[in-house]
Structure formats: C-alpha cells, structure tokens
Amino acid sequence: MSRVCELSGTRANNGMAVSHSHIRTKKLQQANLQKRRLWWEEGKKWLNIRVSTSTLKTIQKKGLDSYAKSQGIDLKKL
C-alpha cells in the first residue's frame, strides 16, 4: 500500500537534511497519514480510508460530501 492520501492525493516530499556544518543530504518527508473511519451521510455508511491530517481538518470544516465534490472524487468507488 502506497503512502498516498486517498482523498487529496498528498504524497511524500523530497527535501534536504542540513547539518550544522551545512552538509546537505536528501531526505524524504512523508505525509502524515492516518487510517480513519468516516461516516458518509449521503451513502449512509462508514468509509475506512487513509487520509492526511490536513485533509481531516478540511473535512471537519466543510464536511465529507462537499470536500469530495470539490476534489472531483466519487465516494461510491471507495
């Protein structure tokens, strides 16, 4: 299973780790993904999905249905 948010598509970011002596090495910054069981009101069922915490905050603010519509996601396929 890949480390990708199922709703927003958030994935890892390539960054640099910089030491005190300014030696730079490549570093992978993973997305903060959580497994959550979210209630889908329109479909009247629970959805078990891997979602990033920033997406969870947006879902709490907007709601699952409106967020999925804004992203163009069909929740019936999840």
Swiss-Prot record:
It holds the Pfam family Ribosomal_L28. Keywords: Ribonucleoprotein, Ribosomal protein. GO terms for molecular function: structural constituent of ribosome. GO terms for cellular component: ribonucleoprotein complex; ribosome. SUPFAM superfamilies: L28p-like. PANTHER family: 39S RIBOSOMAL PROTEIN L28, MITOCHONDRIAL, LARGE RIBOSOMAL SUBUNIT PROTEIN BL28M. This is Large ribosomal subunit protein bL28.
